[in-house]
Design a protein with these regions (language model features):
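The canonical Cys-X-X-Cys-His
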Residues: 119-130
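Inter-heme linker and motif-flanking segments adjacent to c-type heme-binding CXXCH motifs
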Residues: 107, 129-132
Length: 132
């Protein structure tokens, strides 16, 4: 019962934060900082997956929030580059974040490792095309 309550509250907080940030018109730099900077969700998930016994509950919360941020990213306007490229690349990022979330929810370490590896390789192409 306590575990269910904890997960319910954690999920509510995650989605509330995502909704709040979206309502505030969060820009791409803020999304990227929350997701990828040192101490951000992506590095936390990477570190968590390297643990001998991953804390799947924490990883689930972090991956849920990463998917929320990836969703907001796709709805943002890039500082440069065309809209079609942005739509394709941001959808790819969202798809990989969702694959990571799915693997973590299934406590599938190999799947999560593969998904986070693919997610890590998505940065360069998008930054070349769309980052100032």
């Amino acid at each position: 019962m306590k575990i269910t309550t904890f997960f319910s509250i954690a999920t509510l907080v995650t989605f509330s934060l995502g909704a709040f940030l979206f309502a505030q018109g969060v820009d791409i730099k803020e999304i990227m900082a929350k997701a990828n900077k040192a101490g951000g969700l992506f590095p936390q998930i990477q570190k968590g997956l390297k643990a001998p016994a991953p804390n799947w509950a924490n990883l689930k919360n972090d991956s849920d929030e990463l998917v929320s941020l990836a969703t907001m990213l796709g709805k943002s306007k890039p500082p440069k580059g065309d809209a079609a490229s942005w739509a394709t690349m941001s959808k790819g990022y969202l798809d990989e974040a969702t694959a990571l979330k799915t693997a973590i929810a299934a406590m599938n370490k190999a799947g999560a490792d593969a998904a986070i590896g693919k997610l890590a390789t998505s940065c360069t192409g998008c930054h070349k095309a769309h980052k100032n």
